[in-house]
Every structure is written in C-alpha cells, then in structure tokens.
Amino acid sequence: MASALEAIKYDRGRLFIIDQLQLPHVTKFIPIDSSEAGWHAIKAMQVRGAPAIAIVAVLSLAVEMLNLVSENMIPEDGEDVRAYIEQKMDYLVSSRPTAVNLSDSAQKIKLLLDQRARKSGLSGVETAMAFIQHAEQMLARDLADNHSIGEYGATWILKNTRAALEGGNTCVLTHCNTGSLATAGYGTALGIIRRLHEHGRLSRAYCTETRPYNQGARLTAYELVSDKIPATLITDSMAGQLLANPDKKIAAIVVGADRVAANGDTANKIGTYTLAVLAKFHNIKFVVAAPRTTIDMKTKTGNEIIIEERQSSEVTKIRGPCEGDGDHREAVMETIKIAADGIDVWNPAFDVTPAALIDAIVTEVGVETKDSSGQFHLSSLFESMA
C-alpha cells in the first residue's frame, strides 16, 4: 500500500506544505502564496529534497500567477509575462543552487515559454495559464516517476545483492530523507524501501540521523513510523559497525541525489561519500535513486558541482521541545547550544561520491549499471526523450 503521508497539498491557486523544521514533533502545514514565500521556504529548509524543492518552487509561482490572473493584473502582452516568469524562476533557483532539479525545471520552463508565448503569440493570460498547467503536470509526473523508481530499485536489490539472495528478505540502510517529504510523494530511495516492504521482502530499514540537520532522525524516521515500516535509527558514526555486523545482513545502502554528473559522480547530503567508502570495503551494494531530472549531463564530473556551505549554528546548536513538555502540539520549541563557544565550524551541506563507488543508479526508466570498464553511460537514459 502506498504511503498515506502527504507533504505537499495543492489545488489550483492554493499550496500548502508541511513545515519540516517542526517535524517530527509538530505536523503543521504552512501556506505558500507567492514565489517569495516559496524562496524563503526553500532557503530556510522548511521544504528540502531536490525533487520537492523544484515542485514547491514552480507551484509557488503558479499560485502567484493565478492570483494575478484572478485580479486582472496580468499584462496583455505574452512577452511581458514570459519575461516575468523567467525572472521569477531565476530568483527561485538562487534559493538552492545545488539542486539540479530546480535549475532543470527553470530551463524547461524557459523553453516552454519560448515555444508557446514567443512563437505562438499567446496573450499574457494564455502564457500564464500555460505555465500553470505545466506546473501541475510536473507534480503528477513526479509522483508517477517515484513509484517507477521504487519498483525498479526493489527488483534490482532482490536480484543483485548477496544478502537478499542468501536470506530471501533484506535489510537496507538509507541516509538523509528521500521520501514523501522530499518529493511529490512516495519517494526515491525511500520509495525503494517502501516497495520492498510492500512486496513483503524487507526485514528492516536502518536510517542514519544525518547530522548536522538530522533529516534522518527527524524526517525519515517520521515517515517510517508513519508507514509502520520496521526501522531502526542509528547515528552517522555507527554505520561502519552496522555494516561489519554479520547478524544485521545489510543488503544495500540506498540514497538519493541532489545532482548526478554525466559520469555518475553524485552530490548528495553530507555523509553520503563516507557511506559509499564503507560499502565498498564491506562489499555491500551502494545504490543511488534519482529521477532523470536530477542527472545533469552538462556537468561532466563531480568536480564541477558547487557545494553549498551553510551557517555554523546548524552544527553548534540543536532545536526541539523539552522532553517533559508532554503534548508536543503545544510544546515550545527551544534551541540548545551543544558546542564550545568560539570553536570554528566548517559545514558543507553536501559531498560528492565518485562514480567508482556507486553500483547502480535507479531512475524512473530503469537501472543504470557500469560497463566492463567501470563507466556509466547515463546518456542512454535520455534517448527516449530525444
């Protein structure tokens, strides 16, 4: 059964998202009624995960455009509206430059508007409505793609991992959050875990806490508990011991991606690279799950990927309700200092895992593995789109 968790609620002209900063203690939906509200929600990490970021960004502008249409504030000239939408999309991209889905969506929207508005001579309202329809189709397509990723990934793990072949059911480790809270729904890497569970082939999912922002402890654990999937939380530094323990029978590590370069190098949440190195040493499959929109064929290798560095307070402080607050719906969230005053902090949000450490890249159209020379050929994934 698919996940009942819904993190993005959209009806034409209305967008609400779960404020992920308050999870897992408080489940609160906040309205996003403009591109500015979308930008701030992305920047503040009230929404995160490359696919969800792109969807919320585009839908936030769709809501804004429909409001302008309803208030008769849309210019008559389609060219003026096209320029306005493109300017707003560039602004939204600046909220999270590492997430290729967002920049990819912006480029596709510019191409759409060029074809529809400029070449077809659409009016301002027609241009706005063409954009809104594109945004809504993007939401539906992402959800369908995630279900495909889940099926392809689960099937590959069951056919290609030692632990799965030896024991029937399987245990999987994941990092950060790649589920309904990171996508339109169901998830990418977490979608694979969901599919294994739906097939009755998952013994247990392990999730890292994912410091410093604790997406695993706050978000992935929240989703796993919500879906009643057998799961165990570990700290990031326990991963090596988990993989080394033969009783745990970890079949694979499955992660998402913020950007995949043309050669397969993958930028993802900080700590992913460490897990890939551990997987290689312990001969455990390392699987990246991502829609094709996350693959950036213009970026040749991971060396070209810009790594966002975030503020030191994410490392030196932690936020949550006091343990004795009882009903968390009414709890007062507090920020606690956990590091020595004056200590210098380096806080890269992502790292890049070399393609050499990745066994498979799962997309909505299938699973890509390396050839006999150890090279991915990701361009083949786009042949059907040519």
From Swiss-Prot:
Keyword check for Isomerase, yes or no: yes
**Which cellular component terms (GO) are annotated to the entry?**
cytoplasm; nucleus
Name the GO terms of the biological process aspect: L-methionine salvage from methylthioadenosine
Q: Show the Pfam families listed in the entry.
A: IF-2B (PF01008)
List the molecular function annotations (GO) for this entry: S-methyl-5-thioribose-1-phosphate isomerase activity
Kindly list the residues the record flags as site (Transition state stabilizer). Answer: 176
Q: Pathway listed for it?
A: Amino-acid biosynthesis; L-methionine biosynthesis via salvage pathway; L-methionine from S-methyl-5-thio-alpha-D-ribose 1-phosphate: step 1/6
The EC number(s) attached to this protein equal 5.3.1.23
Top-level lineage group: Eukaryota
Q: Which InterPro entries match?
A: IF-2B-related, IF-M1Pi, IF_2B-like_C, Initiation_fac_2B_a/b/d, M1Pi_N, NagB/RpiA_transferase-like
Q: Which UniProt keywords apply?
A: Amino-acid biosynthesis, Cytoplasm, Isomerase, Methionine biosynthesis, Nucleus
Any idea which residues are catalytic in this one? 258 (proton donor)
Q: Does the keyword Isomerase apply?
A: yes
Q: Where in the cell is it found?
A: Cytoplasm; Nucleus
Catalytic reaction(s) noted = 5-(methylsulfanyl)-alpha-D-ribose 1-phosphate = 5-(methylsulfanyl)-D-ribulose 1-phosphate
So what family is this one in? Belongs to the eIF-2B alpha/beta/delta subunits family. MtnA subfamily.
Purpose: Catalyzes the interconversion of methylthioribose-1-phosphate (MTR-1-P) into methylthioribulose-1-phosphate (MTRu-1-P).
Q: How is this protein named in the record? A: Methylthioribose-1-phosphate isomerase
Source species: Uncinocarpus reesii (strain UAMH 1704)
